[in-house]
């Protein structure tokens, strides 16, 4: 196993933490409608819980409106119930086989609460990145101890791992700042 491959693996795992963070913050509701808002909603369907996007089509016809087209008309009630019980503060309006969901304006308190959730997601991602860094550093120490690489090579690799970690954490901070600005925008 060469050290270059190990660095690529560490980078892949760190990029995975960024991707997970992007997914987490995409589901946070901002002032604009986004189909991702309904990602956490699961519906009791056909004897099991299913993600909403597996029983309906979600569209954004207007900036403050979501439209959910349920594929099976017998599921409309279950989808309505799931959205109401999801703690997202949304109240669908049933219109035949479709549900229209007006998105209310976010008040200051709700905005601050969403920013706090975004910070929690960011911290969770940073912890994951630091775990990857620790795994990389432990691997380098072991390789040095086993005599696979020299002390100079180990130090150089450690610096590269630290630089990679710093870059990934600053990317998470940048994404967080963007999302925070988007949430607080009235």
From Swiss-Prot:
Keyword Cytoplasm among record annotations: yes
Annotated GO biological processes are: cytoplasmic translational termination
Pfam families linked to this entry: RRF
UniProt keyword annotations, A-Z: Cytoplasm, Protein biosynthesis
Renumbered residue ranges of the record's region Disordered: 135-162
What SUPFAM superfamilies is this protein classified in?
A: Ribosome recycling factor, RRF
* CC per GO annotation: cytosol
Q: What is its main location?
A: cytoplasm
* Record flagged with keyword Cell division: no
| InterPro entries (UniProt xref) | Ribosome_recyc_fac, Ribosome_recyc_fac_dom, RRF_sf
Subcellular locations according to the entry: Cytoplasm
Q: Which domain of life is it from?
A: Bacteria
Q: Name one GO molecular function term.
A: ribosomal large subunit binding
Query: PANTHER family this protein is in?
Result: MITOCHONDRIAL RIBOSOME RECYCLING FACTOR PSEUDO 1, RIBOSOME RECYCLING FACTOR
| Protein purpose | Responsible for the release of ribosomes from messenger RNA at the termination of protein biosynthesis. May increase the efficiency of translation by recycling ribosomes from one round of translation to another.
Q: Which family does it belong to?
A: Belongs to the RRF family.
- Name it: Ribosome-recycling factor
Gene expressing this chain: frr
């Amino acid at each position: 196993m060469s050290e270059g491959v190990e660095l690529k693996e560490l980078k892949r795992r760190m990029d995975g933490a960024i991707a997970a963070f992007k997914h987490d913050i995409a589901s946070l509701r901002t002032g604009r409608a986004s189909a991702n808002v309904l990602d956490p909603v699961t519906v009791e369907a056909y004897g099991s819980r299913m993600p909403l996007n597996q029983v309906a089509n979600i569209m954004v016809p207007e900036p403050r409106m979501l439209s959910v087209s349920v594929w099976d008309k017998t599921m409309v009630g279950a989808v309505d119930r799931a959205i109401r019980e999801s703690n997202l503060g949304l109240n669908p309006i049933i219109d035949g086989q479709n549900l229209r969901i007006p998105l209310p304006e976010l008040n200051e308190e709700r905005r601050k609460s969403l920013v706090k959730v975004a910070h929690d997601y960011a911290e969770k991602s940073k912890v994951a990145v630091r775990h990857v860094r620790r795994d990389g550093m432990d691997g380098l120490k072991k390789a040095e101890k086993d005599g696979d690489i020299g002390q100079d090579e180990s130090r150089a690799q450690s610096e590269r791992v630290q630089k990679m970690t710093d870059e990934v954490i600053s990317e998470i901070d940048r994404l967080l700042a963007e999302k925070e600005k988007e949430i607080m925008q009235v």
